[in-house]
Amino acid sequence: AVAEDFSGDAEAGAGVFLQCQTCHVVKDGEGNLLAGAAGMVGPNLYGIAGQPAGSVENFGRYSPAMMAAKDQGLVWTEENLVAYIASPNAFLADFIGDTGIRGSMPIGAPNEAAAANVAAFIASLD
């Protein structure tokens, strides 16, 4: 599984994910809620590890910045997920090469360790 390749602490990431559930859920293909509450502002995060950015089915509110990153080949590797979760706008601006671009995710994790833990948690739910 992809999760086994992630270096963060998934258990610690579950606690950090509580901040993410305002906007995100993790629901499997059968609709079972694995994490989160009712947040649907952002995409369902189930199965995103290892997938192209901006590719969650039935989610049509990706920012132009995220779609530009998708068009440039962004894949949610551990490294990319951690960097994005830590600082979403800085990551997208750097990836796209446009310092003026902004995504929809307003804030990131408190630090890189927390971001790594959240990434590991999300990947562990696949």
Write out the residue ranges for each language-model feature.
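Boundary at the C-terminal end of the N-terminal hydrophobic targeting segment
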Residues: 1-5
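C-terminal capping alpha-helices of c-type cytochrome domains
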Residues: 74-126
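Periplasmic/extracellular electron-transfer cofactor-ligation site
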Residues: 6-10, 14-74, 88-99, 124-126
